[in-house]
From Swiss-Prot:
Location of region: Disordered: 56-115, 127-151
Tissue distribution of the protein: Testis and sperm specific.
Cellular component terms per the entry's GO annotation: cilium; cytoplasm; external side of plasma membrane; extracellular region; motile cilium; neuron projection; sperm fibrous sheath; sperm principal piece
UniProt superkingdom: Eukaryota
Domain called IQ: residue spans: 114-143
Pfam families: IQ, RIIa
Subunit-level organization: Homodimer. May interact with ROPN1.
Biased composition (Basic and acidic residues): 62-98
Role, per record: Sperm surface zona pellucida binding protein. Helps to bind spermatozoa to the zona pellucida with high affinity. Might function in binding zona pellucida and carbohydrates.
GO biological process: binding of sperm to zona pellucida; epithelial cilium movement involved in extracellular fluid movement; single fertilization; spermatogenesis
Organism name: Homo sapiens
GO molecular function, a single term: calmodulin binding
Record gene name: SPA17
The protein, known as: Sperm surface protein Sp17
Length: 151
């Protein structure tokens, strides 16, 4: 029973979403007739695997999910290292030279990637147009056959 306009949010246990995703994937893959019985057998097999290998996929999935959503690696900035000003100037000028070379190299690579992508897009579009024309021809021939049958 739900309460209209309620702001109640239930907390799903860690790893439960991963278990349901795995079950859903297997149901879609196997297409069973009796889904509740299939789910029971699936969870039984997961329990047996967990007991034999001491590996819990739900626990592992919750750790991965936690690491993904709670990644604090980019929140704090490292303080800059202090060194001689002369060394910093030489490092900066060296970096500028290196980046300009890499920019040219990457632009050539980008152009090649863009060309390949353009060819793929054009081929897909041409295929789409050809399929549309084939559909039109097929519907026209079906309509002509129906007209001939009606005569």
């Amino acid at each position: 029973m739900s309460i209209p306009f309620s702001n109640t949010h239930y907390r799903i246990p860690q790893g439960f979403g991963n278990l349901l995703e795995g079950l859903t994937r297997e149901i879609l893959r196997e297409q069973p007739d009796n889904i509740p019985a299939f789910a029971a057998a699936y969870f039984e097999s997961l329990l047996e695997k967990r007991e034999k290998t001491n590996f819990d996929p739900a626990e592992w999935g919750s750790k991965v999910e936690d690491r993904f959503y709670n990644n604090h690696a980019f929140e704090e900035q490292e303080p800059p290292e202090k060194s001689d000003p002369k060394q910093e100037e030489s490092q900066i000028s060296g970096k500028e030279e290196e980046t300009s070379v890499t920019i040219l190299d990457s632009s050539e690579e980008d152009k090649e990637k863009e060309e390949v992508a353009a060819v793929k897009i054009q081929a897909a579009f041409r295929g789409h147009i050809a399929r549309e024309e084939a559909k039109k021809m097929k519907t026209n021939s079906l309509q002509n056959e129906e007209k001939e049958e009606n005569k």
